[in-house]
Amino acid sequence: MNMDFLRQQHVSESLLKDVENFRKQYPLTEDMQVRVPNPPIPFYGKDILEMSIATLLKGENLLLSGGKATGKNILAENLSYIFGRPSYNISFHVNVDSAALVGTDTFIDNEVRLRKGMVTLCAENGGFGVFDEINMAKNDAVSVLHAALDYRGIIDIPGYDRIELHPATRFIGTLNYGYAGTKELNEA
């Protein structure tokens, strides 16, 4: 897939130029290239694409809501591809806790070390973190994300480092309303 699908939909050329500049400003290391998705299905919807691209270019995160099978994950994957960013997909369910997101202690070579979670890896590498079904997350899991998602842009891991988000890092949450196991998200 290439960027022609955006031009075929008449997505704003100025937005596409801004995306090109973003990609030049934040080049990827070779080892991160493998994490950039190549979506098998292009997302079609000019208005939604333009709003999403503009939001991400402004340094904001996205929350995509809608019914089941409406293309939220396809859009998220396409946005990672468009921006040329590594994608970190985190599916929320009852067993996802804060340690699964930011990291947990592990024993390596006779010492305790941090095994980094997906959110930490995303933050360090300037990735696009896709929070799939974020409204199924437990409160303690979501609470560790607040400092990363607000103006602070940090992840503070007790006993380890304080990680500042790479300037290209963005988070995209997806949610379905009204399904079993889902709940309202708080304003934070």
Kindly give the residue locations of the regions a language model identified:
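AAA+ P-loop NTPase catalytic core and its hallmark functional loops
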Residues: 1-188
